[in-house]
């Protein structure tokens, strides 16, 4: 009996001592070792003023980009995990006068693309659109807004005063949650100082 207790005590001590050496053989990762790709040019731009880009990735490792071109229209592009173009630069804001600023993007669990931005044409508005890239053949050429849009340009918020800097995320039900900075205050209690507003969109 005493011999069995002694063996189990020795075994426990050995396990505790050996467990301290488990992590010693793991090599430390540095930033230069975890870079997956070299920097690549997403859009050549040329005479265009492409700015304010946002990016997210889907379940297959494809990357989805949205940006403002000439601070007028919103553009979208999709690359595969190797950086090859699946959908080329495509205007996704509706035709007409726009002033697209500060877009944000989130890909949901069904690989649908949720986008929000500020339209500064006239009274500033927070906008939203929903894209389904799988509706395109993803052959590397442009598509059209009508071909991949599930929800067209939807007005999330438009009041007196101005609003800007929207951000978006999605939940486990793929519903969109949008926050933004807004100077609208119906009771005029804060002298039009920016407030934070939030809205959930059930898709």
Identify the role of each PLM range.
Residues 1-32, 178:
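Secretory targeting signatures
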Residues 31-203:
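Extracellular, repeat-based ectodomains that mediate carbohydrate processing or recognition
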């Amino acid at each position: 009996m005493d011999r069995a207790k002694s063996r189990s005590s020795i075994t426990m001590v050995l396990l505790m001592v050996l467990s301290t050496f488990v992590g010693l053989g793991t090599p430390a990762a540095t930033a230069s070792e975890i870079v997956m790709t070299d920097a690549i040019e997403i859009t050549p731009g040329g005479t265009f003023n492409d700015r304010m880009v946002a990016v997210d990735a889907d379940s297959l490792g494809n990357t989805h980009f949205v940006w403002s071109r000439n601070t007028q229209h919103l553009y979208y592009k999709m690359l595969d995990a190797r950086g090859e173009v699946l959908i080329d630069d495509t205007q996704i804001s509706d035709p007409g006068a726009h002033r697209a600023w500060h877009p944000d993007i989130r890909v949901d669990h069904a690989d649908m693309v949720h986008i929000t931005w500020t339209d500064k044409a006239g009274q500033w508005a927070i906008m939203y659109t929903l894209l389904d890239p799988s509706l395109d053949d993803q052959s590397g050429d442009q598509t059209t807004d009508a071909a991949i849009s599930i929800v067209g340009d939807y007005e999330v918020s438009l009041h007196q005063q101005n609003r800007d800097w929207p951000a978006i995320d999605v939940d486990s039900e793929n519903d969109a949650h949008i926050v933004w900075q807004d100077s609208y205050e119906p009771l005029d209690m804060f002298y039009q100082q920016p407030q934070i507003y939030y809205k959930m969109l059930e898709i």
